[in-house]
Amino acid sequence: MSSRYLAAVDDYLHHPSPRYQAHVDLRRELRAYADEERREAARAIAHPERPLLPPPATQAAPPQPSTREAAHPSAPTAASS
């Protein structure tokens, strides 16, 4: 290999192009952003001691459907006979 080629490669490795450096910087920033998102998600995971949502309000008894609403549509009822 020519010494000029080796000198050019050596120069490139020691002084990367602005485009390559921008690529490296962007990847570093994206990794930092992803790490921060992972940390925030880990903090947001619910623990039994501190749930994300308050417990649902309890009702005395859930409403029961009437016999007419509970009957299957194809089943004959006293009113339809």
UniProtKB/Swiss-Prot annotation:
Any single GO CC term annotated in Swiss-Prot or TrEMBL for this entry: host cell cytoplasm
Pro residues bias (residue ranges): 51-65
Annotated coiled-coil segments of the chain: none
Region (Active domain): 3-36
Sequence segments annotated as region (Disordered): 37-81
Record localization: Host cytoplasm; Host nucleus
One Gene Ontology term from the biological process aspect of the record: symbiont-mediated suppression of host antigen processing and presentation
Keyword list, A-Z: Early protein, Host cytoplasm, Host nucleus, Host-virus interaction, Inhibition of host adaptive immune response by virus, Inhibition of host TAP by virus, Viral immunoevasion
Chief subcellular location: host cell
Biased segments, Low complexity type: 72-81
Family matches, as Pfam families: Herpes_US12 (PF05363)
Ranges annotated as biased composition (Basic and acidic residues): 37-50
Family: Belongs to the herpesviridae US12 family.
Domain description: The N-terminal active domain blocks peptide binding to and peptide transport by TAP.
Task performed by this protein: Plays a role in the inhibition of host immune response. Binds specifically to transporters associated with antigen processing (TAP), thereby blocking peptide-binding and translocation by TAP as well as subsequent loading of peptides onto MHC class I molecules. Empty MHC I molecules are retained in the endoplasmic reticulum and ultimately directed to proteasomal degradation. In consequence, infected cells are masked for immune recognition by cytotoxic T-lymphocytes.
Record's subunit section: Interacts with host TAP1 and TAP2; these interactions inhibit the loading of peptides onto MHC class I molecules.
UniProt name for this protein: ICP47 protein
